[in-house]
Amino acid sequence: MSTNILQHVKQLLHNRDVFSFFHNKTGNLNYLDNTTQKPEVFVSPNSTIVSAPTLDSFQALMEKGNFTTLQLAKVGIRMFFSYSVSKYAVLCFSTAIILNRLTVMSSLRSNSTNIRLPLWSKTLLHLVATLSLVKALLQILSQFGLMHELHVSDTDFYALSVYLFVALSDCIEIFISSTTNVPSLICSDFSIWGLSLNLYIISKMPAGQQHIGDNVELLGAVFHRLVIHLVELFHIRAYRLCGEVILNAGFFTAFVTRTYLNGLDFINICLIHNYFPGFFYISTILLASIGIFLKALFTSNPFRSLYSRYKNLEKWWRSNNYNGEEEFNEIALSLCLLLTSNDYKIFKKSDNVKSVDEVAAFSNSYVVSGHLNQLQSTPEDLLSRKEMTTDSQLPGFARTYLGLFELVRTIILTYSRLLKNLLWSKNFESSIDKKPRVGKRKKRDLNKYVTEKNYKKFLYKPDVKELNIESDLRSLELLLPEDDSSKDYFPPRKIDESVSDEEFDSDMESQLIIDEEKELTHLSSNAVDSDDLEEIAWNISMWSILNYEMDVHNKVNGPLTRSQYGKRNPQGVLVDVVIERLLHHTNSRYMYKRLNMKDDDKLEFKFDFAFDSCDEVEEMDLSCLICKVNKRNIVTWPCRCLALCDDCRISLGYKGFATCVSCDSEVKGYSKLNIV
């Protein structure tokens, strides 16, 4: 093959017959006549044939042999401006605006109500998109000569129809996904802009002189979108990755086979741009897998080595939270990094790609705790999957229509088995001799024999002295034993009614109040400055952090951050915040009020919060659960608990506390209420 390339290069340099070289190796379906002295068509740098009036300066440049980078840049700029004023660029711009409006439409509607699309509408829309893509697929296959009855001689009409079918499928997918609040299945390998540029180049070609690489690119774009709508139609989104793996493996096999048989004559620059990443990932995965198998064969226990690799793959899949709806290139890239790493490091999705449902997507800064992430409206995207009912709960297309055959099959099998059992039982009874059936003997109910006259014999113990033990058999059937060996019954001592549980509880409560009053009196008499309070709170917080980090069981890799400490030791963080708020409110004299103060009187305290439970309070207690002073005005999401004030929320947030103080669930955001 290298010898042939050298011969062509020598011929090119000797004769400068550039067009004969390109026309014979561009992979056209119909080759030009070799006797043509001045061909009417030429090729672009990506081996794609376009019409002469578009780039005639490039033809003159190649004929003169003055091929420089500057002249090539001028031709590229002229080609770009020619595409920019074409109808394909206008269609691409219009499609992008429509897709953007459909995406933003979900954020403009009210968050209080959930929109549910009926099953028939979703099925109808996906069916329309599927039929449109099938029509586009048949037109593309007709360009390869597979279906002559569908062949279109007008290349402009062919390119426009394919583009409109693909754009319609994208609009339907974006509309349904944005309406039902589910992630959209997009095909980023074949964008609308690249598709429009490719179709613009095809529209400038005469019929029968299209480059095979351009049509292969269209084939891949239609196939990938067809897989998306099929999995949506049958409600099997988790199998989207399987379909893309089959498509990429099929294209890879076809390209390798054609390259081996006919060389690289069918490849152009657009084909390399769209297919090369996927092919590179597949080649890397195959080579790495072969190396792993060969390494396992030369080990003492090959099955154990392969099993450990399988466990690594399983851990990699779980750690990245893959569900089968991702694109092939995303999964393949992560798998290549895993297979080619020497330290078996699990590359997570969060290392390179941020998930759209993370808390960081709602703000531009890194959120240490959800208590610092303010949300202005009801966050439906933070609610759990069980609470969200945006999608239709009706059965899918397959279960609705194809399930009818399963129902008919079940009914036929049930009645056939019943008829078979009836016929078999009749034949069996007629063929065997009739034998007398022995009925089961019913047990006698002894209670029927007990009457008003003889009940004493059953319920009373006869006098043993009057009975002859040897002759009278009734002595053996006595209901009660002769001697009672059980312990005697002693009634308990009477409880002193003067002492009750209520008085005991009231005594404990009064003692608690007295102790609290003493502590608060001591604190009020020794009030300190705010700076000293902050230093005390800081010392207490640092002491708890150092005490936690010095424990052998709490070692972490690297420095201990606030978020890590908040997740690992939430109880310690909560205690620190309670102490901090208690010191603040005690020093500011918020927790109590002095009433009727005189020189000879004792201190009388009136607490702002009740010591009793909420059931015993006449009105609802809206005091904060942490400081017990301020009113609750913070709602945490997605648990919807109203338990904190704004000051305690700030303290918990900056200390990395990530759970709710009421229900102990993860907090992803908060909203502030104005309670009157």
UniProtKB/Swiss-Prot annotation:
One of its GO terms (cellular component) is Asi complex. This is Probable ERAD-associated E3 ubiquitin-protein ligase ASI1. Part of the nuclear inner membrane (INM)-specific branch of the ER-associated degradation (ERAD) pathway, required for the elimination of misfolded proteins in the INM, a specialized ER subdomain. Required for ERG11 degradation. Negative regulator of SPS-sensor signaling. Together with ASI2 and ASI3, prevents the unprocessed precursor forms of STP1 and STP2 that escape cytoplasmic anchoring from inducing SPS-sensor-regulated genes in the absence of inducing signals. A zinc finger (RING-type) spans 624-664. Pfam families: zf-C3HC4_3. Residues 100-126, 178-181, 299-676 are nuclear. It is an enzyme of class 2 (transferase). Keywords: Glycoprotein, Membrane, Metal-binding, Nucleus, Transferase, Transmembrane, Transmembrane helix, Zinc, Zinc-finger. Residues 1-78, 148-156, 203-277 are perinuclear space. GO terms for molecular function: ubiquitin protein ligase activity; ubiquitin-protein transferase activity; zinc ion binding. The keyword Hydrolase does not apply. It catalyses: S-ubiquitinyl-[E2 ubiquitin-conjugating enzyme]-L-cysteine + [acceptor protein]-L-lysine = [E2 ubiquitin-conjugating enzyme]-L-cysteine + N(6)-ubiquitinyl-[acceptor protein]-L-lysine. Glycans are attached at N24, N34, N46, N66. The chain crosses the membrane at residues 79-99, 127-147, 157-177, 182-202, 278-298. It is a multi-pass membrane protein. Component of the Asi complex, which contains ASI1, ASI2 and ASI3. Interacts directly with ASI1. The keyword Transmembrane applies. GO terms for biological process: cellular response to amino acid stimulus; proteasome-mediated ubiquitin-dependent protein catabolic process; protein ubiquitination; ubiquitin-dependent protein catabolic process. Its EC number is 2.3.2.27. It is found in: Nucleus inner membrane. InterPro entries: Znf_RING/FYVE/PHD (IPR013083).
